[in-house]
Every structure is written in structure tokens, then in C-alpha cells.
A protein has these predicted regions:
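Acidic, Ser/Thr/Pro-rich low-complexity intrinsically disordered segments
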Residues: 498, 592-655
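Substrate-binding/access-modulating region of protease and related hydrolase catalytic domains
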Residues: 142, 243-333, 344, 360-365, ...
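C-terminal edge strands of extracellular/lumenal beta-sandwich accessory domains
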Residues: 539, 552-583, 608, 635-649, ...
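Subtilisin-like serine protease catalytic core
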Residues: 30, 134-260, 274-277, 304-306, ...
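Extracellular S/T/G-rich loop segment that most often corresponds to the catalytic His/Ser-adjacent loop
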Residues: 177-194, 329-404
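Hydrolase catalytic cores
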Residues: 215-219, 246-247, 277, 371-434, ...
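Inhibitory N-terminal propeptides of secreted protease zymogens
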Residues: 23-120
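C-terminal subdomain of the subtilisin-like protease fold in secreted/lumenal serine endopeptidases
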Residues: 80, 370, 408-477, 481-484, ...
Length: 802
């Protein structure tokens, strides 16, 4: 994301950059970018004693050798962040042309761009409940430290009054002026080249707000008087707070501040090094290839280091349905939290309609892990104010606070122990009047008092069998340990929530704790497609503990389809008429009716095969022309399987929060940072009558913005300004063309590569022109490093009207 100033053209009239302008705080770029380099040895997380000291020596040596090689080989490169605990590597700002050289340096395991993350609260609401979530625990989290990795906390809010606190030894850390005896850390993690004037401050007086609300839920002081005279309290009101501002960049789409993976990983690294007991991330983005998901991997490492990561599940269910759960909630070891209505307000708990659902779209993990209040939650906002807000952003800090309470009472518990205690002791929540499946509510509504006496700890705490084909045998062994008073014989049964003909879960009728239990699904050769999910119930007298499980029986229709090989980028034509109809639903995400894109595609399909011999930055297609009446639209799947979409990038919707067109439909589908393998581009239509001919553009590794050239800087009054725009990769997206003259919106017409900008009404003399244009790949870019808006060109110029 960086960057340097743009290129002054020969006439000294126009100025080009490869990302949005400086007025909105979006970093500029011209030929440089920030990437995350991972080195060969594992990070230090979880390594102690003599082995830990040896590992530290080895990591330090590797990093010193890498830094020396970087200086000698790429003199202009700069190390922005160093990672030792949660990753072994560094964030490096390099010329983009030098990235292949960087990959070839000795000891380099991988070079990744990372993802951009945004906040996952929904909107402020008008009614709800304050007070304190009734955890049933007597303690208040005294001495525990909760790190909030978010958009910056207003430490002056009365909910965080330092009265009665003493700064713990070794603190404050970071920018001391933004700390108190309650908020003991204040750090800001700013991408290189960011121009937003408040980016480096731990609290942004213009854009920050979300983190202050989140922190109040987790650890606001008990007995604070809120608006309307209500007495409120955080879940762990005596806990310390660490403020890690990793979201620093304003967004064009108005979704608040965004942050990128390099900075979020740096914040996780700092929180672990600072001694936080719990970290909360109420942020999210569509899942990317799990082996390349830097933030999720860093959270896994934080858990290995003994820090509890708690993450919001996301708010996309209404639009994207099952498989909408976002990264970094996809982290295997994190506690991922769904949102329910506030039981303190309603007396019962139902899942919020927006709360994202599992399985995770690419890794197919069973998430979320738990549910907590996330609807109409009263908490602090900057300026000593209070608001009710809704979102899984509000649910996660309830669990962060509960985790702090439990760790205070059980200091020897591992992260896995705490996670298992919470998941196994949850109570059922409802959705649409029925008990929610684990893919919606995880282990259920968290019950910290029951988790305090877990009895049995399961490993894994929940089980995903993934996609199972008929007739294929599989099994997963779960280890059960005594969590305190749980030793002995327990009865075992299945609590089914969703069943499918021909599939069942086979279990022994009893199990002795400590011991193991084997979960063995039976899927007959004639089994129907569908989900088999529910809970394995362990019962001993009145005591019940549960293990959530999920699988889906699949019969891929596209497995028998014929695919045409796409060997080179370029323009292609196709026609779905006369082709077979082999698939009607694509997942994951499994878009519901009325969601963001077509949910059911019942037309005939035409397939084109993309084979990658190496990982790629991206690939994709855009339909540029359809015959009259045709409603053909694209999807991208793993070869031959409509159940394996390449995540959100496979759906024809604009996914880039830095674009004003965020959320709009667009006839583009692709994959972001795909690994080597075979993929199918599928052209389908909602109905058989929507079949027809079409033309499409195909690209691979489009990481460059369009070109834009002003043909003449001096024109007569009334004569249009002409700008030549072109893109050799995915092509110009005309919906992204934005023209401003002297700061005001202006009109332009794009035809055959020339943009005609009207000068009607302009006075004679000099004027400032600003043009922004993106290509179609930009609509796929949840990966926005390097740089932010890597596939967007901005042209600014002084023009003269004669």
C-alpha cells in the first residue's frame, strides 16, 4: 500500500498515480508496494525454555541475513514491520518490479500481499439494553489485559475513567499521551505512504468510533452512568485495555477506516509482545486461500503463544447466506462469535438475521464457535457520548470480556482449554423459531458460568467433515479430558438439527472420560445432497456438554461437464444454448434468495477450464457483451465442483470497499491469490430462457492499473477534453469513471477508448482536472496491498480553456 508521488509528464501538466488521491487519505503509489515476506523457520509462538531460546537465536539470525541480502540486492527496499512471534518475517516496501527478486532471496519462504479488512458493525439502533451482560461469574477481570485491534479508542471517555486504577509495571506502552491507568497501551500501525492526517494517532478524532464502542462492551467501568441515566458496565469492568489502532485508512464507500494485513499482523505481534491476555478483532473480509491468509495464521500463532483471539463472524448472512463467515474469523484457533438478540432486553436469544454463517467458504471449517449479544448494544462512542449499535462487532467483545473473566479464575488454562469450555457449555439459540444449526450459532449462546465448570474438554471442540461424497467413509477422533469433576462414564447421543436421507453419524453409546470418541459418518451410495449437522451430546445425570458437528453430502453435477481450456488471456465468445443444465446452486457462499446475486441458476452451463501450474495473484473473466434476452452470468469453481466456489471473488458483485461501487452487481467473477490447480469458469443463467451467446475477457495476474493520457491540455471553450484510457488486462470498467473539474463532479462519455469531458460552462483560464478509472479486476480486490486500489488510475492535470 504505499507510496511515492506520481510521475510528472513531459509537459509538466499532468500527474499520474496508481491509487486514489491524497485528499481522502488513500495512499498514493507509483511502482512500489508493501508485501509480507515469510522466512523459512517457524515463528516463536508457543516455544519456551531452551528450545525457545534456540529458536529465538535462529529467527534473529535468519532475519539479520534477510535484511543484509535485501540491502545488497534491492537497495531501495525498506523494512516496515518485523515479525518474530506470530510470523517469522517482515513487511517490506519494495519497487513492484523487484518482487520476483525478493522471492528469490535466500531463506524466503513466501511473499504475500495480504488482505484489506473493514469493520463489521452494522448500524446504530434506537433501542436496546445497557447494564452488564449477566455472566454469572463473581469476578470483574482485575489485572487482565484485553487488546482491542480496531480503529482507535477514545481513552478520555468516562467509561474508561482511570480513577481507582494503577498503571501496571512495564506500562504504558506506545504513545503515552493517549494512555491512562485504564487504557495502558496506545499504538497506531500506519501503512507506508498513508497521507490521512490522523492516521498515525492512536485515536482519530474524525473517523474513529467503532473501537470505543467495542472496548466499552469488553471492559467499560462498572457503574458508569450512560445516556438516559442508565447504569452500565463492561463484561470485565476491571480489566485493562490495550488500544491497537490497525485500521487507519478512510474508505471511498463510507464503511469507516480500513486496515491491511501487514499492519494488522504487526498489531497482533505487538499485543502478544505487550502481554495482552485476550485480543479482540471486530473486523472482517472475505476469506482468501487459507495457506495465504496472513491475519488468520497470525491469530493461530497468537493462540499458540497463550493469547486468546476473539473475532467477529461478520454480518453478511442476509446477502450471502451460508458460507458467508469472514476472515480472520476463519482462524482455526480463534473464538469466532455470532450475534444474537440481547437476552437482557428480550428474555430470550434469537440469532440476528445479519449474523454470518459457516462453513468457512474455502477452508470449510465449522464456524462460528459461539453466540453472544450483538443487537442493540449500548456502549461508549467518542466525545463522551453513547449509542446503541448492532453487529457481530458487538458480539465478539462480550466473549473477549468473558474470556478475561475465565482466565482470571483459571490462569493455567490454555487457549484451547478455554475455547473448548465455552463451546461445550453453550445453550441453544433459535433462528426462525427453530434451534439454530452449528453453522449459524456455533456451540450456542455462551454461558460463562457453565464454562467456569466445564467438566469435559473436547479436542477438537467442534468437528467439520467438510464435503462428503456418497459411499465415502471418513472418521474424526475427539479426545475428551477431565475439565474438573468430569471423570467417569458419559452417555453419548446425537442431537440432529438438519438431516439428509442416507446419511447418519455413528457413535458408541457411552464414553469414559478421559478417553476418546470416534465420530464416523455413514453416507450411503444413494444418499441425497444436503447438510447433516447438529451436536454430539454428552450426558451424565443432569450434566450435559455438547460437541457441534457438520458435514454436507454432495453430488457435483459439473463433474461430468466438458470444459474448454483457456490457455491465454484475451477475448473469447461462448453460447450456453443447447448445453446441458447440470448445476443450479453454487456454494460457498451459498447465496439465499433475495441476496446480493442470483441464488439459483437453472439455465444450461458452458464451462471453460483454467489450469494454474503456479500460484497467481488473480485471474478472472468479465462478460462484455450478451445477445438480446440473454442473462448469462459467470461463476468460478474448483474444477468440476459447483460446491467449491473460489469464495466471494467467484460472485458477480463489486467487493472492493475502497470503490464507491462497492456492493453493486458487475458481470465479473474470478479468484484472488489462487493456488496451483484447475478451476472452471462457469457461464450460467437464472432460467433456461436466459441462455444465449456472450463475449468475455479473460485475464491472469492483472496487477496493473489502466493507462490514462490527456491528449491536449489547452482547448477552446466548448471543445471537449479528450483522455485516452486503456487497460491490457481485465479492461476498463466504465462504471468507475469519475471526473471532477475544480473539485466539482463533471460528466464524461467513454467510447472506443476515448473519454470526452464536457467543458461547457467553464470560464476561460486554468482549471484542475481529476480523473479516476479502474479496471474490472479492481472489483475483485479485497487484496489491496500493494497498493490500495492497485488496479485504479488517477490522472490529475491543469487544463486551460481558451
Amino acid at each position: 500500500m504505499i507510496r511515492v508521488s506520481g510521475l510528472l509528464c513531459a509537459l509538466a501538466l499532468s500527474f499520474l498515480t496508481a491509487a486514489g488521491g491524497t485528499a481522502d487519505g488513500i495512499p498514493t503509489a507509483r511502482g512500489t508496494g508493501e508485501v509480507v515476506v515469510t522466512l523459512a523457520s517457524p515463528p516463536l509462538a508457543g516455544r519456551t525454555g531452551a528450545a525457545g531460546r534456540a529458536a529465538r537465536t535462529n529467527v534473529d539470525r535468519e532475519q539479520a541475513q534477510f535484511a543484509a541480502a535485501l540491502r545488497n540486492t534491492i537497495p531501495g527496499a525498506q523494512i516496515r514491520w518485523r515479525y518474530r512471534i506470530v510470523l517469522n518475517g517482515a513487511a517490506v516496501v519494495v519497487p513492484r518490479a523487484a518482487i520476483p527478486i525478493l522471492r528469490a532471496l535466500p531463506g524466503v519462504k513466501s511473499v504475500d500481499t495480504g488482505a484489506a479488512y473493514r469493520l463489521v458493525s452494522t448500524t446504530a439502533t434506537a433501542a436496546g439494553a445497557g447494564g452488564r451482560w449477566q455472566t454469572g461469574l463473581p469476578n470483574q477481570g482485575a489485572g487482565m489485559k484485553i487488546g482491542i485491534i480496531d480503529d482507535g479508542i477514545d481513552q478520555r471517555h468516562p467509561y474508561f475513567s482511570p480513577v481507582g486504577y494503577t498503571m501496571p509495571p512495564g506500562f504504558p506502552k506506545g504513545q503515552a499521551a493517549y494512555t491512562t491507568a485504564k487504557v495502558i497501551v496506545a499504538r497506531s500501525f500506519v501503512p507506508a505512504g498513508t497521507t490521512w492526517r490522523h492516521a498515525s494517532k492512536p485515536f482519530d478524532p474524525v473517523e474513529s468510533g467503532h473501537a470505543t464502542h467495542v472496548a466499552g462492551i469488553a471492559a467499560g467501568n462498572a457503574g458508569t452512568t450512560a445516556s438516559g441515566g442508565a447504569s452500565v458496565s463492561g463484561v470485565a469492568p476491571r480489566a485493562y485495555i490495550g488500544n491497537y489502532k490497525a485500521l487507519t485508512v478512510p474508505t471511498a464507500s463510507g464503511v469507516g477506516l480500513d486496515g491491511n494485513a501487514a499492519e494488522i499482523v504487526a498489531a497482533i505481534e505487538a499485543a502478544v509482545a505487550d502481554g495482552m491476555d485476550v485480543i479482540n478483532l471486530s473486523i472482517g473480509e472475505p476469506e482468501v486461500e487459507p495457506s495465504r491468509d496472513l491475519v488468520a495464521l497470525a491469530l493461530d500463532a497468537a493462540a499458540q503463544a497463550g493469547v486468546v483471539p476473539v473475532v467477529a463472524a461478520g454480518n453478511d448472512f442476509d446477502e450471502f447466506g451460508r458460507g458467508s463467515l469472514s476472515s480472520p474469523g476463519t482462524s482455526e484457533r480463534a473464538i469466532t462469535v455470532a450475534a444474537v438478540t440481547n437476552p437482557d432486553a428480550t428474555g430470550s436469544s434469537s440469532l440476528a438475521s445479519f449474523s454470518a454463517a459457516g462453513p468457512t467458504p474455502l477452508s470449510l471449517r465449522l464456524k462460528p464457535d459461539l453466540s453472544a449479544p450483538g443487537v442493540s448494544i449500548l456502549s461508549s462512542v467518542p466525545g463522551s457520548r453513547w449509542e446503541f449499535m448492532s453487529g457481530t462487532s458487538m458480539a465478539a467483545p462480550h466473549i473477549a470480556g468473558a474470556a478475561a473473566l475465565l482466565l482470571e479464575r483459571h490462569p493455567t488454562w490454555s487457549v484451547a482449554d478455554l475455547r473448548a469450555a465455552l463451546i461445550g457449555s453453550g445453550s441453544s439459540v433459535q433462528v426462525d423459531g427453530q434451534i439454530a444449526a452449528p453453522t449459524r450459532g456455533g456451540g450456542g449462546l455462551a454461558d460463562p458460568a457453565r464454562a467456569d465448570v466445564p467438566l469435559v474438554l473436547a479436542s477438537p471442540a467442534s468437528v467439520s467433515f467438510g464435503l462428503v461424497r456418497p459411499g465415502i467413509a471418513t472418521a474424526i477422533r475427539v479426545a475428551l479430558t477431565d475439565g474438573g469433576g468430569g471423570a467417569g462414564v458419559w452417555d453419548v447421543a446425537v442431537e440432529p438439527i438438519a438431516a439428509v436421507a442416507g446419511a447418519s453419524l455413528v457413535l458408541a453409546p457411552t464414553v469414559t472420560v478421559p478417553g476418546v470418541i470416534d465420530l464416523s459418518p455413514t453416507v450411503t451410495v444413494d444418499a441425497a445432497e444436503g447438510d447433516l449437522t447438529g451436536f454430539v451430546r454428552l450426558k451424565r445425570g443432569a450434566d450435559v456438554r455438547r460437541i457441534p458437528f457438520w458435514l454436507r453430502v454432495v453430488r457435483p453435477g459439473l463433474a461430468t461437464a466438458t470444459a474448454v481450456e483457456l490457455r491465454t488471456p484475451g477475448m473469447y465468445v461462448g453460447d450456453t444454448r443447447g448445453k446441458p443444465s447440470l448445476a443450479s446452486r453454487y456454494r460457498y457462499p451459498d447465496v439465499p434468495p433475495g441476496g446480493g446475486v442470483s441464488a439459483v441458476l437453472q439455465g444450461p452451463e458452458q464451462l471453460f477450464r483454467v489450469t494454474l501450474t503456479n500460484p497467481a495473484a488473480n485471474f478472472g473473466v468479465v462478460i462484455v457483451r450478451r445477445s438480446k434476452g440473454a442473462r448469462v452470468e459467470p461463476r468460478v469453481v474448483s474444477a468440476g465442483d459447483e460446491n467449491r466456489l473460489t469464495g466471494y471473488a467467484a460472485l458477480p458483485i463489486n467487493l472492493n470497499p475502497y470503490l464507491a461501487e462497492f456492493g453493486d452487481p458487475v458481470l465479473v467473477a474470478g479468484a484472488v491469490r489462487p493456488i496451483a490447480g484447475s478451476y472452471d469458469v462457469v457461464f450460467d443463467s437464472p432460467t433456461p430462457g436466459g441462455a444465449g451467446s456472450y463475449a468475455f475477457r479473460f485475464w491472469i495476474d492483472d496487477t496493473r492499473p489502466p493507462t490514462a493520457r490527456l491528449t491536449q491540455a489547452r482547448v477552446r471553450r466548448g471543445t471537449p477534453l479528450l483522455v485516452r484510457v486503456a487497460d491490457t488486462g481485465s479492461g476498463i470498467d466504465p462504471t468507475t469513471v469519475k471526473v471532477r473539474l475544480d473539485g466539482s463532479e463533471s460528466s464524461g462519455m467513454l467510447r472506443s477508448g476515448t473519454l470526452r469531458i464536457s467543458t461547457t460552462g467553464l470560464r476561460r483560464g486554468s482549471h484542475r482536472l481529476r480523473l479516476q478509472v479502474s479496471d474490472y479486476q479492481e472489483s475483485r480486490n479485497t487484496e489491496n496491498v500493494p497498493p490500495i486500489l492497485p488496479n485504479t488510475r488517477v490522472l490529475t492535470a491543469t487544463v486551460v480553456i481558451r
